[in-house]
């Protein structure tokens, strides 16, 4: 079963049936589902300054006939919500008729791994790494006045259901690690900043001894 329907009253086959029935007389369209999770952990002045986590999901239902485009969206993935969206689309396009274009060119190119960086490490291990960075930099001398380090992690899941039950999926990881250091000596301050990130897991950038 799709991850989008695990905690709802609708399953994949019901969603596919809704898409097929709604778009049967349309030129184009799809049900686009998206789930987005993000986290941020900031260490500053020898302590964890902030920690945030957000999670959102929803869908967009699109139907196209000729020059008319109908669109409905909701953050509630349920039978009733999909039914209302379907009714709204059909009402908008009821005077139009077309032939659905099923084909979508596929590249099947793999640009990044199918991973969830937020779940790839425990919260405690992320805190330990930030503390390790802080301790390492401060061990370089008393001129280290301030250290700020933070993790930023995102994971976005996308699923597109076409009227012929063709399902396209993509999981997009994104991580970033930033650190800034303020040095002070003889009343003079200097700041150094470094950052690294990409569509990978935390492990690709933060390893023991690195």
What is each of the regions a protein language model found here?
Residues 39-94:
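N-terminal alpha-helical targeting/anchoring segments
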């Amino acid at each position: 079963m799709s991850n989008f329907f695990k905690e709802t009253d609708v399953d994949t086959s019901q969603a596919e049936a809704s898409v097929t029935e709604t778009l049967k007389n349309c030129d184009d369209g799809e049900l686009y589902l998206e789930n987005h999770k993000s986290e941020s952990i900031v260490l500053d002045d020898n302590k964890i300054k902030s920690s945030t986590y957000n999670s959102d999901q929803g869908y967009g239902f699109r139907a196209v006939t000729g020059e008319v485009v109908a669109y409905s969206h909701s953050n509630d993935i349920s039978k009733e919500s999909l039914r209302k969206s379907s009714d709204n689309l059909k009402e908008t396009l009821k005077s139009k008729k077309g032939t659905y274009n099923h084909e979508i060119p596929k590249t099947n190119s793999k640009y990044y791994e199918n991973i969830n960086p937020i779940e790839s490490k425990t919260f405690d291990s992320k805190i330990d790494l930030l503390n390790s960075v802080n301790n390492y930099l401060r061990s370089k001398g008393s001129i280290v006045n301030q250290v700020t380090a933070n993790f930023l992690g995102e994971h976005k899941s996308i699923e597109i259901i076409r009227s012929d039950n063709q399902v396209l999926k993509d999981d997009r990881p994104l991580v970033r690690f930033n650190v800034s250091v303020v040095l002070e000596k003889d009343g003079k301050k200097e700041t150094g900043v470094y950052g690294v990130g990409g569509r990978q897991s935390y492990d690709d950038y933060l390893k023991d001894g690195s």
